[in-house]
Design a protein with these regions (language model features):
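Active-site-proximal loop/turn and secondary-structure-junction residues that shape catalytic pockets
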Residues: 88, 127, 176-178, 217-219, ...
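Transmembrane beta-barrel outer-membrane domains
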Residues: 30, 59-66, 100-106, 150-154, ...
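A broad helix-preferring feature
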Residues: 2, 21, 268-270, 280, ...
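Beta-barrel outer-membrane channel/assembly domains of diderm bacteria
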Residues: 14, 21-121, 159-166, 170, ...
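Detector for outer-membrane/organellar transmembrane beta-barrel domains
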Residues: 193, 200-300, 306
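Bacterial N-terminal signal peptides that target proteins for export
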Residues: 2-11
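A short hydrophobic/aromatic micro-motif that marks alpha-helical segments and, especially, helix-coil
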Residues: 23, 92-93, 180-181, 222, ...
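Surface-exposed coil loops of outer-membrane beta-barrel proteins
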Residues: 24, 42, 47-63, 92-108, ...
Length: 357
């Protein structure tokens, strides 16, 4: 009888130790795990009754639309951190316009190695360093997108290194041609892209001022075209309530066979004023120079566009409501009126609901 009690006690102790070990292992694993995400939906109406939107993600007219559900997981172990960022919906599909199948879901997938407290090496696929605006609606002050964002790079897949020098940083890397998760068999003739792009950034992040000079250069070999992009983003916080942002980008396309170069550029200004902790007012003004007609914006000749967006963000906990009015005018008739006739200006109203966790 004593032996039976001893056996039971031993089994109980072993079970308790095993359970404690499992809990310790689980706690150790979950300690390095972070989970975040967002979801957004919107309604947009063009005042002409026609779709006159020429930028990303908000084209449908007079329609309730699903934006994107996003789920981001990061896990850290020592000097290594892995990030998996998954998106489902219209934004994710347009973001991954070159991809198909399961790659449509992958916004970001990369591994960071903190070689020192100043040097970080990253391998995988990540959203671009170029530009002021971001893919996720919850991370932008204004829901609709600028031309600079819509026709600039979305993401890069490759290898990069970032080095911190006080408040400055220097980043350099090599990547597949813009917006390609893989360069294998992706050329127009079904062959492989043979060259990699060079990507880089020099940045400063101060208490009130932040500024980043960004770029990408590369060849689309075996295609004869090449691209060079220089981009500047900056933000200045005048007070705790008032912020100014600027984005200037210039893209030059050249060809190894044909002579001459083509260019497009954009200058964007952003103003944000926090009325209260729950309400912010936003304004964006953009001047797009598409005189070489690189972007083919609804006309057989080149044009310029001046776009103005007035927006508000109303917050309640994790929820955001974003109403906006957008007005555009062009040097050419790139929009249409209610009868389908070409015209040189457009306007629309949009309201979006965003939840971030």
């Amino acid at each position: 009888m004593k032996n039976l009690k001893t056996i039971k006690k031993t089994l109980f102790i072993c079970s308790a130790l095993s359970y404690g070990l499992v809990l310790a292992q689980e706690k150790s694993w979950t300690d390095g795990l972070k989970l975040s995400g967002s979801a957004d939906v919107f309604y947009k109406a063009d005042f002409s009754g026609k779709n006159n939107t020429l930028t990303s993600f908000t084209a449908p007219n007079n329609s309730f639309e699903l934006g994107m559900f996003s789920l981001k997981l990061t896990h850290n172990t020592g000097k290594f951190t892995t990030t998996a960022d998954i998106g489902i919906g219209n934004r994710a599909e347009q973001f991954n316009y070159n991809e198909s199948d399961s790659k449509l879901l992958i916004k970001q997938l990369f591994i960071d190695y903190a070689a020192t407290d100043k040097l970080t090496i990253t391998a995988g696929s990540w959203t671009t360093h170029v530009g002021y605006e971001l893919l996720d609606a919850a991370d932008n002050d204004i829901y609709s997108m600028s031309y600079a964002f819509s026709y600039g790079p979305f993401f890069h897949t490759g290898l990069k290194a970032n080095y911190l020098i006080g408040k400055f940083n220097v980043m350099a890397g090599v990547a597949n041609p813009t917006d390609l998760k893989s360069s294998f068999g992706k050329a127009p003739d079904g062959s492989d892209y043979k060259n990699k792009f060079f990507i880089w950034q020099v940045g400063y992040a101060g208490d009130k001022l932040s500024a980043y000079l960004n770029g990408q250069q590369g060849s689309y070999n075996p295609v004869s075209s090449n691209i060079s992009q220089f981009d500047l983003t900056a933000a200045y916080k005048f007070t705790d309530k008032f912020k100014l942002g600027v984005n200037a980008t210039n893209v030059t396309l050249s060809d190894d066979v044909a002579s001459g170069k083509q260019n497009w550029s954009s200058l964007v200004g952003y103003l944000k004023y926090d009325v209260t902790d729950a309400v912010a007012l936003n304004y964006r003004a953009e001047y797009l120079d598409n005189k070489d007609n690189v972007l083919s914006l609804g006309a057989p000749v080149g044009n310029t566009v001046f776009a103005n967006t007035v927006s508000a963000t109303i917050k309640s906990g994790a929820f955001q409501l974003k109403p906006e009015l957008r007005f555009e005018s062009s040097s050419e008739d790139i929009y249409v009126d209610k009868d389908g006739n070409a015209k040189s200006n457009s306007a629309n109203f949009l309201i979006a609901a965003v939840y971030k966790f």
